[in-house]
């Protein structure tokens, strides 16, 4: 298997149509619930192996992902890379932070892995946590890139298993809001 297709996402109920508030606060007519895609451990492992293969040349020593969406895929990427640790960040008082005793060693080479990238805001927050702790971010990976950019983190290496072009809007400019379509908040930041 190379990458992931929209048909695969649809088949497992992970591609949703409607009116959604994304974690970034923006609105969209489509939502990718990667947790449903990753609910099958074999599928999660395969996705982790694929993403790891695309990022192996970064020679990472650590994978860091934001909770909640990035935890499964980040763990699977770390496992596939072998001899690589996995940490996750969490929000505390609105700020992304390391907790649970996770400590980044100065100079460690870290990949940041996420489930879906739209604006890249959460990913950049994780990158800031890593660099503030003295680590070096050496690449970024995601299951889905819906940012509209080939590499939203250039010049760092970036890999995604699925790239889609789905418009997203500021709430004030959302045509779905104007039409009165009910808004659903399916993400981890509701």
List the model feature ranges, each with a label.
Residues 1-190:
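PRPP-associated nucleotide enzymes
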């Amino acid at each position: 298997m190379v990458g992931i297709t929209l048909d695969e996402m649809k088949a497992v109920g992970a591609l949703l149509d409607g009116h959604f508030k994304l974690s970034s606060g923006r609105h969209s007519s489509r939502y990718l619930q990667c947790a449903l895609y990753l609910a099958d451990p074999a599928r999660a492992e395969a996705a982790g192996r694929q993403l790891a293969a695309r990022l192996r040349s970064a020679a990472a020593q650590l994978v860091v992902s934001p909770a909640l969406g990035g935890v499964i895929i980040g763990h699977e990427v770390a496992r596939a890379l072998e001899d690589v640790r996995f940490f996750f960040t969490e929000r505390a008082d609105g700020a992304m932070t390391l907790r649970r005793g996770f400590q980044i060693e100065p100079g460690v080479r870290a990949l940041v892995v996420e489930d879906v990238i739209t604006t890249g805001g959460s990913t950049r927050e994780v990158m800031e946590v890593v660099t503030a702790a003295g680590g070096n971010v050496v690449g970024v990976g995601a299951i889905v890139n819906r940012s509209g950019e080939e590499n939203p983190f250039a010049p760092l290496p970036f890999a995604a298993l699925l790239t889609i072009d789905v418009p997203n809007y500021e709430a004030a400019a959302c045509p779905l809001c104007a039409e009165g379509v009910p808004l659903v908040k399916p993400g981890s930041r509701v």
